[in-house]
Regions:
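Extended acidic/polar, glycine-enriched regions
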Residues: 38, 44-53, 66
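N-terminal targeting/anchoring "stem" of glycan-biosynthesis enzymes
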Residues: 265-266, 376-390
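Nucleotide-activated chemistry modules centered on ATP-dependent adenylation/adenylyltransferase
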Residues: 1-20, 51, 56-63, 69-114, ...
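Short glycine-rich, basic-tinged beta-strand/loop micro-motifs
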Residues: 28-34, 60, 65
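Solvent-exposed strand-loop boundary residues in beta-sheet-rich modules
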Residues: 23-25
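Short Lys/Arg-enriched alpha/beta "domain-start" segment
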Residues: 1-16, 27-29, 33, 39-44
Length: 393
C-alpha cells in the first residue's frame, strides 16, 4: 500500500489535507478538512499511517509512505502491528517505510476531545480530569457515520454545538471521507476506530497538542477492540499526545451525568440503528442506555429517547458478550436498589437468555472482529467451566 501525492487545499476558513492511497486493486484519495486555526502543518503524513496500518494488514501489503512521518510513531508501529496481529492472527504483519523521519517540533497547547453525543463521549467531555488538563476544544466529525443523510448530518452538528455551548467550550467541526475508504476493507468501524480517530487527531495538531479519545471499555473489560487503552496512545507523536480516557461502565457514566451534569441528558444520542439524530428506543444500545437512565431515575430527562421503555423489545433481548453482561448485571442491581424489581426481572431475563445461547459462532471475514473474537473465546472458556448447583447466569 502506497501513500503519495500529499496535497493541501485552502477554502475560506478550512484547510483540507489529502493523499493518494494505492494498493493492489484499489486507488483512493483520502482527505480530512479542519478549521485553519487547528490545522496541522503540511508535509506531515503521520496521521495517514494511523488510518492505513490496519488496512494494509488486511490487504496483505506493507505500507510505504512517500512523505515524512513522526519518528516516535514509526518506532511504535511494530508494537501496534503486534497487537493487531495477536488480536486477529489472519492479519499480515505489515512493515512501514517512510521517505523521511520528522524531527520533534513541539506540541500546541490545545486540549481536545471527540464529541459524538454518545454516553462515552458525553461523559468524557464533561468529567473533570487532571491529565492532560482541562479541555479547550470539543471535536465533532461530519460524515463519520455513513448512515446519516445530509439533513441528519446538519442536525447532528447543530445539536453538538448546543451541547458544547452547555459545556462552555468551542466546537471544532471537521470532515473526512475516511469511512468510504475503510468500510470496504474493514467492515466493522469498531475494529478501525482507534486508528481512525488518531488520523483525525493528527490533522488538528496545529492547534491541539493533546486529544482525548472517549473510552468504551469498563475497568474489568479492557479486552481487544479497535479503541483501547492498550492501543490508542501508541498513535501519538512528539507533536500530538493521544489519550484513551479512563474506563468506566456505561451505567456508571450515566449515573454520573445524572448527578453532576443533568443539563446534558437531552443531548444524549447513542443510536446508529437508523438514519436519525435522536434514538430509536429499540436497539440494544438504546435499551442499555434507557435502562441505565431508568436506574438513575432520569429517563424522562433524556428527551431524545422515547419516554417509556419498550418492554417487548427488552423481552426479546439476549445479552451476550463480556462487557454487555457486566453492564446489564450492574443495571439490574441499580434497578433493585431503586425498588424497580419488575424491570430488574426483565433485565435478569435478558441475561438468562444470553447465557443460554451458544458461545460459538462464525467470525466475520469482512473485518478483523477483534472484540467478537475475544468475547467468543472468553464465553467458550466460561461455558467449559463446571457450574455449581444454583449458579446464576
Amino acid at each position: 500500500m502506497i501513500v503519495d501525492q500529499l496535497g493541501t487545499r485552502e477554502r475560506a476558513d478550512d484547510v483540507e489535507r489529502s493523499a493518494r492511497i494505492r494498493w493492489d486493486g484499489g486507488d483512493f484519495r483520502l482527505f480530512v478538512s479542519t478549521p485553519r486555526r487547528v490545522a496541522a502543518p503540511s508535509g506531515d503524513a503521520s496521521g495517514f499511517v494511523c488510518a492505513l496500518l490496519l488496512l494494509a494488514m488486511r490487504v496483505g501489503e506493507d505500507l510505504e509512505v512517500r512523505s515524512s512521518v513522526s519518528r516516535r510513531l514509526l518506532e511504535r508501529v511494530p508494537r501496534i502491528v503486534d497487537l493487531y496481529a495477536t488480536w486477529d492472527p489472519r492479519l499480515h504483519r505489515s512493515r512501514v517505510r517512510a521517505e523521511q523521519e520528522l524531527e520533534p517540533r513541539g506540541a500546541a497547547a490545545g486540549v481536545g476531545c471527540f464529541l459524538s453525543r454518545g454516553v462515552d463521549s458525553m461523559h468524557s467531555v464533561a468529567v473533570p480530569r487532571g491529565l492532560p488538563g482541562a479541555l479547550t476544544e470539543l471535536v465533532h466529525c461530519d460524515r463519520l457515520e455513513p448512515k446519516h443523510s445530509v439533513a441528519v448530518r446538519a442536525e447532528e452538528i447543530r445539536l453538538a454545538r448546543e451541547a458544547a455551548r452547555e459545556l462552555g467550550l468551542p466546537l471544532v467541526v471537521i470532515d473526512t471521507n475516511l469511512r468510504e475508504l475503510t468500510d470496504p476493507i474493514v467492515a466493522d468501524w469498531a475494529d478501525m476506530v482507534g486508528g481512525g480517530l488518531a488520523f483525525l487527531a493528527h490533522a488538528m495538531a496545529g492547534g491541539l497538542g493533546h486529544v482525548v479519545i472517549p473510552s468504551s471499555a469498563a475497568p474489568t473489560t479492557v479486552i481487544p477492540t479497535g479503541s483501547s487503552p492498550m492501543l490508542d496512545a501508541m498513535f501519538s507523536s512528539d507533536e500530538l499526545e493521544i489519550y484513551h480516557d479512563a474506563p468506566a461502565t456505561r451505567p456508571a457514566k450515566v449515573a454520573w451525568l445524572v448527578r453532576e451534569r443533568a443539563e446534558l441528558l437531552p443531548y444524549l444520542k447513542v443510536c446508529f440503528h437508523e438514519d436519525r439524530s435522536d434514538n430509536c428506543g429499540r436497539c440494544p444500545k438504546c435499551l442499555t442506555t434507557m435502562l441505565s437512565l431508568e436506574a438513575a431515575g432520569a429517563l424522562r430527562l433524556a428527551t431524545a429517547f422515547p419516554p417509556e421503555l419498550d418492554r417487548s423489545a427488552l423481552a426479546e433481548l439476549a445479552v451476550q458478550g463480556i462487557q454487555p453482561r457486566e453492564e446489564f448485571r450492574e443495571i439490574e442491581w441499580r434497578l433493585r436498589e431503586r425498588g424497580a424489581d419488575e424491570l430488574a426481572g426483565l433485565v435478569a431475563g435478558a441475561l438468562a437468555r444470553g447465557a443460554a445461547g451458544p458461545p460459538d459462532g462464525e467470525l466475520p471475514t469482512d473485518s478483523p472482529a477483534f472484540l467478537a473474537r475475544a468475547e467468543r473465546d472468553a464465553m467458550r472458556a466460561l461455558a467449559s467451566q463446571p457450574r455449581s448447583r444454583g449458579a446464576g447466569p
